């Protein structure tokens, strides 16, 4: 018997208003044939590779933490092109256009030789080797050992006009049901945050807030035991509607498991035994040992983990000291540096050598020491890093049209304020009162709401600021990266009315005649 039934599927209606389409910068930014070369000084930093060193009172930082496993986030400040005194004023019309920078090429220079760094902990939480054990070793109240290892090898850089977005796992707030027991595992959640200069990268133990989630302070090495390791959230940045945080990136990671250990301590999640499923033994993971065996009363821990190794460090697989050219960015922002700034996030632990410095503590002449005594020498650790940044910038124009300004205003209204295009309301009264001695007791109190100053949106974040406002040059052929750019693009540099421009090099070779017999 056929019975009619109403359709159970949902009916999806289109939105009542059209969805705004985000345009690519190539659709409204006009590029010129004027290129600049920008370069930084040699950027150096020195510190302790594992932790900050304070004075005896702990009130003053004496030696900062400088590790090869840290993120280096450079904030490059570029000059405002709208304030340039261009020799050729026909390049743009300041009444109808605004100038912006576009990043066309970058080279991240790294100094210092290749080297492998070692990290570790003098009280590392490991019971023993679980790969090739020769006897059954049960855990005790304290099985910590002095262990060191080399971290995962990592080379990476991310270029954008906004800070790089990172991700890590952190402690989450539990549900308020009142059934939380003391010592139970807390819930965890994925957190997005800006990667700042000095934030630790993943060295093989994951992107985790170790300070909050490893309270024994013994499960990882000293350099991350009190830190939060972050990893760039490539999925979020690739799906960003504007693509300001990541124009493009390059990365190379490698590691392998070198040693296999087991943790000490009480197991939080016991191995399911035979009592589940009403004793049917369907989910039993092991057969109980004999009562005469040591493991009968003291079963070993099942918290297995490896120590990773970055393996070989070679100059054949280097991402640095070579140019990268930006033709098409992964997002809608094709290399336009809004607010005249560029963020370069770098991680490179292939130059991870830590210097060991030994000093005679009693001050005697080393040549007069007859018997070696290790207690008379004080050992220090230092790590150094060396960077140099070079850029190729292209001068671009943005027409001040209504549809373009609406697009930019929806993206970030502060850009229009930076261009001094903000909405200025008509004055209510043409005559205003101005007191001469406004701060004196004889006059009324000054305005409680003074005009707001320009606020840096990243003032609470820590970056390595690099000022390039006076480091630009039109003479591309005078610099290494500039010559590479001219050669790879098939361009030649010319001077027109005092302005350096580049044009295509066209070859005019004659036709080869056929040889007569």
Curated annotation (Swiss-Prot):
Q: Which InterPro entries match?
A: Capsid_L1_Papillomavir, Capsid_L1_sf_Papillomavir, dsDNA_vir_gr_I_capsid
Q: Which SUPFAM superfamilies match?
A: Group I dsDNA viruses
Under Gene3D superfamilies, the record lists:
Major capsid L1 (late) superfamily, Papillomavirus
Q: What is its main location?
A: virion
Biological process according to GO: endocytosis involved in viral entry into host cell; virion attachment to host cell
Q: Where does the record place it?
A: Virion; Host nucleus
Cellular component terms, GO, for this chain's entry?
A: host cell nucleus; T=7 icosahedral viral capsid
Tell me where on the tree of life, at the top rank, the source sits: Viruses
Is the keyword Calcium in the record?
A: no
What does the record give as the function of this protein?
Forms an icosahedral capsid with a T=7 symmetry and a 50 nm diameter. The capsid is composed of 72 pentamers linked to each other by disulfide bonds and associated with L2 proteins. Binds to heparan sulfate proteoglycans on cell surface of basal layer keratinocytes to provide initial virion attachment. This binding mediates a conformational change in the virus capsid that facilitates efficient infection. The virion enters the host cell via endocytosis. During virus trafficking, L1 protein dissociates from the viral DNA and the genomic DNA is released to the host nucleus.
**Similarity annotation:** Belongs to the papillomaviridae L1 protein family.
Give the quaternary structure.
Self-assembles into homopentamers. The capsid has an icosahedral symmetry and consists of 72 capsomers, with each capsomer being a pentamer of L1. Interacts with the minor capsid protein L2; this interaction is necessary for viral genome encapsidation. Interacts with protein E2; this interaction enhances E2-dependent replication and transcription activation.
Its recorded name reads Major capsid protein L1
Origin organism is Human papillomavirus 25
* Gene name tied to this protein: L1
């Amino acid at each position: 018997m056929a019975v009619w039934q109403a359709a159970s599927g949902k009916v999806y209606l289109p939105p009542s208003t059209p969805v705004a389409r985000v345009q690519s910068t190539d659709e409204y930014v006009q590029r010129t044939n004027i290129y600049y070369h920008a370069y930084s000084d040699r950027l150096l930093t020195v510190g302790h590779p594992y932790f900050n060193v304070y004075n005896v009172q702990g009130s003053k930082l004496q030696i900062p933490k400088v590790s090869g496993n840290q993120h280096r986030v450079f904030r490059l400040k570029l000059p405002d092109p709208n304030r340039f005194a261009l020799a050729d004023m026909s390049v743009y019309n300041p009444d109808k256009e605004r100038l912006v920078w576009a990043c066309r090429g970058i080279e991240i220079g790294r100094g210092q030789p290749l080297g492998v760094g070692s990290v570790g902990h003098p009280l590392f939480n490991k019971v023993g080797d679980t790969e090739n054990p020769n006897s059954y070793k049960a855990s005790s109240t304290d099985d910590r050992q002095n262990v060191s290892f080399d971290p995962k090898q990592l080379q990476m850089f991310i270029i954008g006009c906004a800070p790089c977005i990172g991700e890590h796992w952190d402690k989450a707030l539990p549900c308020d049901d009142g059934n939380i027991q003391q010592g139970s595992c807390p819930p965890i959640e994925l957190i997005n945050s800006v990667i700042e200069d000095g934030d630790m990268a993943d060295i093989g133990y994951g992107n985790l807030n170790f300070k909050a989630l490893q309270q024994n302070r013994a499960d990882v090495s000293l350099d991350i035991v009190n830190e939060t390791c972050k990893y760039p959230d490539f999925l979020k940045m690739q799906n960003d509607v504007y693509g300001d945080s990541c124009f493009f990136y390059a990365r190379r990671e490698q590691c392998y498991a070198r040693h296999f250990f087991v943790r000490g301590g009480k197991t939080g999640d016991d191995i399911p035994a035979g009592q589940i499923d009403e004793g049917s033994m369907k989910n039993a993971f092991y057969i109980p040992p004999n009562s005469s065996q040591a493991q009968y009363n003291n079963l070993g821990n099942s918290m297995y983990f490896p120590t990773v190794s970055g393996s070989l460090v070679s100059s054949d697989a280097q991402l640095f000291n070579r140019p990268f050219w930006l033709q098409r960015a992964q997002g809608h922002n094709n290399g336009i540096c809004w607010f005249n700034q560029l963020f370069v996030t770098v991680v490179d632990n292939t130059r991870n050598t830590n210097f060991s410095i030994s000093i005679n503590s009693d001050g005697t002449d080393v040549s007069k020491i007859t018997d070696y005594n290790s207690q008379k020498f004080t050992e220090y650790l230092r790590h150094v890093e060396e960077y140099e940044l070079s850029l190729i910038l292209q001068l671009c124009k943005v027409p001040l049209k209504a549809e373009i300004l609406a697009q930019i205003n929806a993206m970030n209204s502060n850009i229009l304020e930076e261009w001094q295009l903000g909405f200025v309301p008509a004055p209510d009264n043409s005559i205003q009162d101005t007191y001469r001695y406004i701060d004196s007791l004889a006059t009324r109190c000054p305005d409680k709401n003074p005009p707001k100053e320009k606020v840096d949106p990243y003032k609470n974040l820590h970056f390595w600021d690099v000022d390039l406002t006076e480091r630009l040059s039109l003479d591309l052929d005078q610099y290494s990266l500039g010559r590479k750019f001219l050669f790879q693009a098939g361009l030649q540099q010319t001077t027109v009315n005092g302005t350096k421009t580049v044009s295509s090099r066209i070859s005019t070779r004659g036709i080869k005649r056929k040889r007569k017999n």
